[in-house]
Amino acid sequence: MNNELEEYLDFAKDIAKHAGEVMIKYFNQNNGASYKGDKTIVTLADTEINSYLIKKVKEKYPLHSVDGEEEQFGKSDYVWVCDPVDGTAMYARHIPVAVFSLALVIKGQSMVGVVLDPFTNSLYTAIKGKGAYKNGEKIMVNDYALEDMKTVCHYDLWVGADY
């Protein structure tokens, strides 16, 4: 199973590389931001990345399924879960605080994951039981209690708006 998981990770990294290129391509131009029925924002990058993932999964792993934020495909014990642009609201406003995230869930267990920040060229990867990495370097989680890690952040999305 370990070699298989490494293969899945390589696949996920390839998808992430393409996703990062798409995110950068649309970032400084008209990104086609619009509202979905649930009032959340979607951009051209979201839909293009999601469609690309489904195409590639169908080609390489036709028995797997995809649960993408913008579109789903198939029903399987092997599910690629994707948020093509995690942070779409910021991305749509040309604020570089968004990432691509993809995980492979096998029989309900997250086994492989990648998160790419295309604005800092940071690629985070993990295989269950093998640790987490940033750009190939092992990283560690801290042991702080959650309540000790509270952060408050404020910014104006609409400068000049009459609140």
Q: What label would you give each PLM region?
A:
Residues I54, Y91-H94, T125:
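Short, function-defining helix-loop hinge/capping sites that tune catalysis or transport
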Residues A103-Y163:
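Acidic beta-strand-loop-alpha-helix segment within the catalytic core
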Residues W80-T120:
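Glycine-rich active-site/cofactor-binding loop and its immediate structural neighborhood
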Residues E71-F73, H94, V105, Y144:
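Short polar/acidic secondary-structure junctions
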Residues N28, A98, A126-K130:
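A short, compositionally biased
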Residues M1-V85:
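N-terminal subdomain of lithium-sensitive/metallo-dependent phosphomonoesterases centered on the IMPase/IPPase/PAP
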Residues Y26, M90, N135:
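Residues that scaffold the ATP/ADP-binding catalytic core of kinase and kinase-like folds
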